[in-house]
């Protein structure tokens, strides 16, 4: 299976439209959204074309393929307008080989700084902790937890490392895809 992984949209209609175009091109089996979908948050600047009401139908059109977890900027009111479950702090997927992918935003389970996993749950060797929250791309083995892959797709709309991005998981491997701005 092919998973497209995105995080931290923060209500940007422009970047959500770009993401939908990428989804149409990539043709993933499932879309993983790691939280912070509609609200920009009190510490972030407004993203380009901040329009949560325009983001809602774009995401709802993909609801049957979305697996989502709650970010620190997501609330019950967001769940009222989105057609897919959003309020879980984590979800677990297993790929074709049985590898566990632990999906979380990162504010509750373990992604404080760049690759900190101090609050990560115990995961079997060979698992992956897939998280957002920091707006910084990561794809590396954990130094603190041997056998644990850390993957952060970066931010769709407010990157803190210079490039808008999402991730792909396919064939047991993670990769980043940079989104270009018009």
Residue ranges and their predicted role:
Residues 107-182:
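Conserved beta-sheet core of the metallophosphoesterase superfamily
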Residues 42-50, 82-123, 160-161:
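Active-site-proximal segments of metal-dependent phosphoesterases and phosphodiesterases across multiple
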Residues 61-63, 88, 96-98, 124, ...:
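Short, well-ordered coil/turn elements that cap or connect secondary structure elements
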Residues 5-7, 31-36, 66-72, 102-105, ...:
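Active-site neighborhood of phospho(di)ester-bond hydrolases with catalytic His/Asp-centered motifs
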Residues 1-3, 92-102, 143-150, 171-175:
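Beta-strand-turn-beta hairpins that frame and shape the catalytic cleft
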Residues 12, 28, 34-35, 78, ...:
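Aromatic-residue detector
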Residues 2-95:
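Core catalytic region of metal-dependent phosphoesterases/phosphodiesterases
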